[in-house]
Each structure stands twice: as structure tokens, then as C-alpha cells.
Amino acid sequence: GKIINKTVYLCVGLKQNGLKEVLGMWVGKSESSSFWMGVLTDLKARGVQDILITCTDNLNGFTDTIRTVFPQSSTQICVVHQIRNSCKYVVYKDKKEFTADMKNIYNAPNKEVAAAELNNLERKWGGKYPYAILSWRNNWDDLTVFFQFPLEIRK
């Protein structure tokens, strides 16, 4: 036999009652906007009428694809991916402290407090890691969409 690595992409929906439901699984060679266009049109063809909010890894073109198929959907960049991306710019000895400081941003109770925490992060680390901070600034609107929703949806 031969072992072949395959990637399976999973779409999970969160119902209004808080229950999660697997909407589908797709095997793909790579994440591309055309791949996701196929996934989203498949979901729509199978009856998905509305998506309140999506959470993506900020793949180039993915957000535009979502907005094409489900124009009313809000799109949130995945905070875990943002943290990983930010940490690429931080040396190992600072990562633990830097990550703890970032946690204050995404655990904030609202967008205003989150913005203040980002300012604190920039004051403390901006001189040493400007690109890590710039990544947050450049993506701020798409990183803070979830603050428009109740805590139950954010978790």
C-alpha cells in the first residue's frame, strides 16, 4: 500500500440554539478562492440561505468569495491565525510574554477595550516588533467583527 496525505476541509455551522452542526467535508489539494467558491455554492445549493458570520484564516481571496456567495455575511479573521502570524515576528524568549499581552486584546469585553489593549501592546512591543503590531492594525476591522455579537457566539 501507499500512504498519501490528503487535506479535508470542514464547515461547521452554529445554530441559533448554540448547537454545532457539520455542514460538509471536502477533500482539496489546496485552499484557493476557486476551491472555496465551489464549497460555498455547494452549501447554498443544499439549502444554506444565510450565514451570520464566518471565521476564516484570511486566505487571499477567501473573504471576497464569501461576500460573493453570501453578501450579507460578516467575516471575522480567526484570532488563532492572527496570533500565529504575529508570533512569526517575535523571538523565542519574548513569545510567552508577547502572547500573554495579545490575550488582553482578544479577551477584552468589547471593541473599545480591545483597542486600548492593542495600544498597550504597541507601546510595550512596537519598537521591537513593529510588523507584529502592524499585522493587527492592518486587519483590525476584520479581527473585531465578533464584538458585535453576544459572548455565546464569540466562544
Residue ranges of predicted features:
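Hydrophobic alpha-helical scaffolding
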Residues: 26-29, 52, 56, 88, ...
